[in-house]
Amino acid sequence: MRCVPVFVILLLLIASAPSVDARLKTKDDMPLPSSHANIKRTLQMLRNKRCCPGWELCCEWDDGW
């Protein structure tokens, strides 16, 4: 009967412990791109599709993006 309070206290301590990501980072781990970077990349892709092929000046003058 003496073990029950100790067991309950241990359970409470384990449940309140902060969670930690136990996985080690490797050299292959890369951070996910932010949503700002995704939007910027999408707008750049759309701008490249709108540009005149073979004449780069039409893209340089278009600063509306």
Curated annotation (Swiss-Prot):
Gene Ontology CC entries for this record: extracellular region
Q: Where does the protein principally reside?
A: secreted
Q: Which residues carry this modification: 4-carboxyglutamate?
A: E60
Q: Does the keyword Membrane apply?
A: no
Signal peptide positions on this chain? 1-19
The protein's superkingdom reads Eukaryota
A molecular function annotated in GO for this UniProt entry is: toxin activity
> Is Repressor given among the entry's keywords?
no
* PTM field: Contains 2 disulfide bonds that can be either 'C1-C3, C2-C4' or 'C1-C4, C2-C3', since these disulfide connectivities have been observed for conotoxins with cysteine framework V (for examples, see AC P0DQQ7 and AC P81755).
Q: Tissue expression, per UniProt?
A: Expressed by the venom duct.
InterPro entries reported in the protein's UniProt record: T-conotoxin
The record lists the membrane-crossing segments as none
The places in or outside the cell where this protein is found are: Secreted
Which residue stretches, if any, does this entry annotate as coiled coil? Answer: none
Which Pfam family, giving just one, matches this sequence? Chi-conotoxin
Instruction: Note the pro-peptide positions.
Output: 20-48
Keyword terms of this UniProt record: Cleavage on pair of basic residues, Disulfide bond, Gamma-carboxyglutamic acid, Secreted, Signal, Toxin
Q: Which family does it belong to?
A: Belongs to the conotoxin T superfamily.
The free-text domain note is: The cysteine framework is V (CC-CC).
Q: What is this protein called?
A: Conotoxin mr5.1b
